[in-house]
């Protein structure tokens, strides 16, 4: 039993790691290092993180995940996009790709639009091109049998995807046909060349009025029918032909904002941001683009947040204000900070969280960035701190970030690794970090399933923060406290005699190692079936200026360490 004249030095509630300062100088409630410790489920307690379970076994490394859409969970694995484990799009080239759910005007289904080197869209009906290419063949008109048309006429035609009489998407028009002069005749139509695009159901014919220059809708013809005739009187023609239904350019990033699809990472125009017509993501007029900065600072990504639109370049970021009527205008942020790892960008109630060269930040685009990574600064400046290797920026393209339930999960490459090998977890409530020793190649949040999911290099898609094992494998946890100098400070020598461990190990064995001035002075094997304070002797002559504890556990349950108290006697200087 501890002697009554000994003084206690107790650990307070723990909040997370601090790599910014010397282990003697960090706050009493901060830790020098942690691995696989969960500070979210029970703040202040040392306990293993929650586990992970297998959702899908894949075929290759998962490098993009999107939350479930209807009955599908989408992932990009190498150059293929999968809906669950079914390949739905191939040839997905480039370092980045974006998968964006969008329900276009008149549609009854939501499509997953795939921005990549091969622009596609997928729904339960199958995979088709994103947008419809215009006809390139020139139609031919001629005078036909007796009819009601008199004057000079020409036509143009488009390709369309229709359901019944409703147009879902339509291309730009063909070249203008020849002019034909009629005198109470029918206009015959030929060379209405069929589209080879599987999504096209109809050819839509637009005709002038007599001597007119505008093209008005005349009729729809089933795709594959290459001839026809126009008989309607001029007053029966309806909608004006649209000439700005361009399919989107090849881009590798897309997002929805104000019912439009915005697109960037255009390799031919790296500083462009394109935007579609409202409600019509497959129509991106050639004039609908913004030049952001200059080509030497390419746009990396964009997001919609709290009614605002923001874009990141490598060096800075911009808020895009305005609308179709007033025009869109980019305004550079007061914090000139961009990102080279766009998959770390995450929209959340805490702002838009992202990773930059100098740390993890939250932004609104309209005000100064808020830094979240002060306590782990060392890994951003090429330092190895308390066993944590610095970030390897050569792997920045593979970094991922996701906010879920009050935490930001940041998966990155450390040391010499070129694929992610560790996850840093920021707790917004505690304003501190923990680290998980798991290799994650993609992250996503599924609100409908209340889950954070992840991809791994073997193609597996897993659910994080569930259960107490990693797919039946044990979890190894460790935590190292600060160097406690006790009330007297680091200049007064002390004799440490006992240590008390307040824990509930759930029947498991947790090891608590006590170091005095970096010398191991006691190894405590703590095993309890309920919360208990256990007292342990330290080695005789455990004298020194400061002490620390190292807590370790490997297993498949959830032991908890609440507090450690070292009992000591201050020694009078000679």
Regions inferred by a protein language model and the residue ranges of each:
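Inter-blade boundary loops/turns of WD-repeat beta-propellers
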Residues: 84-86, 124-125, 162, 208-210, ...
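Surface-exposed extracellular loop regions of Gram-negative outer-membrane beta-barrel proteins
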Residues: 309-334
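Beta-sheet repeat architectures centered on beta-propellers
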Residues: 1-110, 184, 297, 336-340, ...
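Hydrophobic core segments of beta-strands in well-ordered, beta-rich domains
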Residues: 113, 255-264, 303-313, 353-355, ...
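Disordered, low-complexity "stalk" and linker segments at domain junctions of extracellular
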Residues: 2-5, 12, 88-269, 280-289, ...
């Amino acid at each position: 039993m501890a002697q009554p004249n000994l003084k206690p030095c107790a650990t307070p509630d723990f909040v997370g790691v601090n790599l910014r300062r010397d282990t003697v100088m960090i706050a009493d409630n901060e830790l020098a290092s942690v691995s696989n410790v969960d500070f979210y489920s029970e703040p202040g307690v040392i306990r293993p993180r929650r586990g992970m379970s297998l959702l899908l076994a894949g075929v290759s490394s998962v490098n993009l995940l999107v939350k479930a859409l209807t009955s599908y969970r989408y992932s990009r694995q190498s150059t293929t996009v999968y809906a669950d484990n079914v390949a739905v799009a191939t040839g997905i080239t480039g370092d980045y790709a974006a998968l964006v759910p969008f329900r276009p005007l008149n549609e009854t289904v939501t499509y997953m639009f795939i921005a990549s080197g091969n622009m596609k869209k997928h729904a339960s009906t199958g995979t088709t091109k994103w947008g419809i290419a215009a006809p390139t063949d020139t139609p031919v008109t001629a005078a036909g049998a007796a009819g009601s048309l008199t004057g000079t006429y020409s036509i143009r035609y488009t390709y369309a995807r229709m359901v019944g009489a409703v147009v879902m998407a339509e291309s730009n028009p063909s070249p203008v046909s020849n002019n034909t002069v009629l005198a109470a005749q029918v206009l015959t139509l030929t060379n209405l060349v069929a589209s080879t695009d599987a999504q096209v159901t109809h050819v839509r014919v637009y005709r002038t009025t007599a001597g007119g220059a505008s093209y008005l809708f005349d009729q729809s013809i089933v795709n594959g029918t290459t001839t026809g005739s126009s008989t309607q009187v001029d007053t029966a023609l309806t909608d004006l032909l649209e000439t700005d239904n361009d399919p989107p350019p090849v881009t590798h990033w897309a997002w929805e904002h104000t019912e439009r699809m915005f697109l960037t990472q255009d390799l031919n125009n790296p500083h462009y941001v394109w935007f579609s017509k409202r409600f019509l993501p497959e129509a991106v007029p050639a004039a609908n683009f913004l030049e952001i900065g200059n080509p030497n600072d390419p746009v990396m990504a964009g997001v919609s947040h709290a009614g605002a639109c923001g874009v990141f370049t490598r060096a800075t970021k911009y808020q895009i204000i305005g609308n179709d009527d007033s025009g869109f205008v980019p305004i550079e942020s007061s914090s000139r900070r961009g990102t080279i790892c766009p998959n770390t960008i995450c929209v959340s109630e805490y702002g838009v969280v992202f990773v930059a060269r100098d740390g993890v930040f939250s932004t609104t685009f309209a005000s100064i960035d808020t830094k979240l990574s002060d306590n782990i600064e060392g890994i951003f400046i090429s330092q190895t701190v308390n066993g944590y290797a610095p970030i390897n920026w050569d792997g920045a393209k593979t970094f991922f970030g996701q906010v879920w339930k009050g935490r930001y999960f940041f998966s990155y490459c450390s040391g010499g690794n070129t694929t992610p090998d560790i996850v840093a977890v920021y707790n917004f409530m505690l304003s501190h970090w923990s680290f998980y020793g798991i290799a994650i190649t993609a992250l996503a949040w599924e609100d409908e399933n209340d889950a954070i999911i992840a991809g791994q290099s073997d193609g597996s898609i897993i659910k994080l923060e569930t259960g107490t094992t990693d797919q039946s494998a044990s979890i190894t946890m460790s935590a190292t406290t600060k160097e406690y100098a006790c009330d007297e400070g680091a200049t007064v020598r002390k004799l440490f005699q006992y240590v008390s461990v307040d824990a509930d190990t759930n029947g498991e064995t947790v090891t608590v190692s006590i170091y005095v001035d970096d010398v191991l002075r006691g190894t405590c094997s703590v095993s309890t079936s309920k919360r208990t304070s256990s007292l342990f002797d330290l080695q005789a002559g455990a004298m020194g200026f400061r002490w620390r504890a190292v807590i370790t556990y490997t297993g498949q349950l959830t032991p908890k360490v609440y507090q450690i108290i070292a009992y000591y006697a201050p020694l009078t200087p000679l």
